[in-house]
Amino acid sequence: MLNRDSIDAVNFDPAVEESLQRITAPMTTAASYVKSVEDAIYTHPKLTDDYDAIDVYIDTERYTIVPRSVAEDSAAMRDIADSLYPSERLNVVCTCAEVPPFHGDDGGEAFAAMFIEPALEGFLRRTFVQARIMHRMVPLTRYFEACGRLLGNAGKMHIHRRAHAVDIIAFDGKGLSMANTFATAGGDD
C-alpha cells in the first residue's frame, strides 16, 4: 500500500506455511512525492525482490468509479481528470481496475479510475514488472461484494475506518451503489 507517508507491504509464498512478512518503509521528506517513494523502496531491498505477482495499491483521493465504456475511452478519462483536478491539467495518468458491477437494470461493469502523476506510474512500472497498479478501494469493494454473495445479496453498507478517513461502500442487492472515502478529524466524526 502506497500511503502518503509510508509504504506498507506484505510478501508471502502460498506454498510455505508461516511465510508472511510485513515491511513498513517510511517515506522521507524528499523534494517530491515520487522521489520519496523511490527512496523508500530502494532503502528496503526486499521490496524489489523478484515475485510471481505484485499488486500495488495507492491511497489517493484522486479517483472515481466509472462504467467500462468511460474507462476504455481515453478522451473521456482525460475530460474527467481535467474537470475533477483542473489545477493539475495534463499532469495525471489514469489507471483502472475492475470493481463489482454497478447497480441498476444494465448491471454494467464498473472500474475504479485513479489519477496519478506520470512520473509515479513510470517508476512503479519500471520497478515492478507487470505489477497491477490500482486504487486502495478496489480490494475493499471486491471483498465486501464477496461477503454479500456469501451472506445474501440484500442491501448492505460497509464502513472501513482508518486513522483520518472512513471508506463507505454500499450495495443495493443488485450491485455497487457507492464507494467513497471521507476525511475525518477524529473518532467522533
Feature roles, as predicted:
Residues 8-146:
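Active-site neighborhood for divalent-cation/phosphate handling
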Residues 175-189:
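Accessory, usually C-terminal, subdomains that scaffold auxiliary metal cofactors
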Residues 81, 145-149, 153, 184:
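Short alpha-helical interface elements
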Residues 124, 169-171, 179-181:
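A short secondary-structure junction signal
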Residues 110-114, 157, 184:
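Short, surface-exposed loop/turn motifs that are enriched in glycine and acidic residues
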Residues 1-15, 148-174:
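Gly/Thr-rich phosphate-binding beta-strand-loop-beta motif of the actin/hexokinase/Hsp70
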